[in-house]
Each structure stands twice: as structure tokens, then as C-alpha cells.
Amino acid sequence: DKEYFEVATRGVWRQIPYTQDSEQILPPSLLPSPEVYFATCLQDKEVWPIWQYLEEYDEQTLFSVIEILYDHIGVYNYETDQFENEAQKEEFAEQINNILRAYKEGYYLEPTNGFIMQIPNGALREQLEYDGSDLPDSVYEQLATATEMYYRFDANLEQKKKAINILADILESEREEVKDTLNAEYEVPKNEHDKLIFGIVNGYNIRHNRADQKNDYSKEIWYDWMMQYY
């Protein structure tokens, strides 16, 4: 009833003054059509319209549909000629999370990055809410990519390993600054901490796939630690 997906599915139209005609001022974001958009994204023709196929969705399809809807929700403000979605996203996430938290062991639509994950603890949720305002766009994009790759509901061990690798690459580009920061704040000899940081990813089959790599460890446990550490 609130038409939060009207812009996504139909675009924005307005009447041409002194005529009976209308013109499109903003194309729909689900191009070329919702049916084709969802079929292309999910490689499944039986997704849209939702009301028709909802009961046939598996978990991955359902969660992916929710994520796509979150990305495309919003309304057009004719007074300012601007597309707005902040309030709509907040409302959508709140309502969806009321449902997701009661599903199985509990899930959560992460509002900053827009992906579904298992319910995070308070410390992790605070990290996920970071908006990257004090980072260069390119670095924040890498950080957001790694975050979604690691924590999304369907992430496997290979994806988690790649996410850790991305974070290590970010630190690599700031290696000297990281050394100085650790030395100043934690009074740790900077070369020792540097060796620890990069020794992990370089020696535990994260960055390299050589015979001398340590690979016999509980990856589910240690990957979580590495992700938090980096």
C-alpha cells in the first residue's frame, strides 16, 4: 500500500504540462523488467511475481529476494525531485528482522551492507554498522566486499578465506603506518607485530597454496578469529 517498490518496478512518470501525455523522468531499477531481473540474478525463472512463487522458494532464494528488495526499496519525492530510501530501508529492515530472528537459529538483515547473516553479537554488530566515512572510497568498497563475502548467510570456507585475504591486502597497502600505530598504541615492537600479522595469512594457506603452508587447523574457528583480528 505504501508503494515502496513502485519506482523499482515502474519508474517515475509525470504529466507533461498543457498536454494529456506523460513522460518518464526516472527509469525503473529492476530493468528490463522485474521478471527478467530476478531470473537473471538468481538464475531461476520462477521468482517474480513473488505472490505466485513464494511457496516454492528455498531458503537461498528467499533470502536473496529479500536482499534485492532491500537494495531497490524507496520512493520519489516530487517536491525535491529526489529518490529517497533511507527511511524506507530502515522500516523494511526492522520488519524483516522481526521475522528473521525467529527463523531457525535466528537471522539478521544487516542494514549497512544489505545482506542476510546469522544474528551477530553486539560487538560484531557494532563493527558492521561502520559506514566508512573516514576511509577512501576504494578502501571502504574492499572492506564492504570482504564483510559481505564472509558473513553472508551462504558463505563457504573458500569465500571466507578470500574475505580475509582482502582485509590483509588492505593492511598491506598501509603496512608502514600500521607498524607505527601498533608500536605507539600497544608498545609492541613494530616488526614483531608486523611479522605476526602477515605471517598468519602468508603461512596458513590464506594467500598462498604451497606445500609448506599450514593447513591442518580448525578453519571455522580460526577464520572467525582472523576476520575479527584483521
Question: Model segments located where?
Answer:
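Alpha-helical repeat scaffolds in large eukaryotic proteins
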Residues: 67-70, 74, 151, 171-175, ...
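Long, positively charged binding patches that form subdomain-scale interaction surfaces
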Residues: 108-191
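Short amphipathic alpha-helical segments and their helix-coil junctions
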Residues: 34-53, 138-155, 204-214
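Helix-loop junctions and short alpha-helical segments
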Residues: 67-142
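Alpha-helical oligomerization segments
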Residues: 165, 176-230
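Residue-level detector of well-ordered alpha-helical segments, enriched
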Residues: 57-65, 162-166, 197, 226
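Helix-start/N-cap signature of alpha-helical segments
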Residues: 58, 156-159, 163, 219-222
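Charged interaction/catalytic cores of defense and host-pathogen modules
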Residues: 1-99
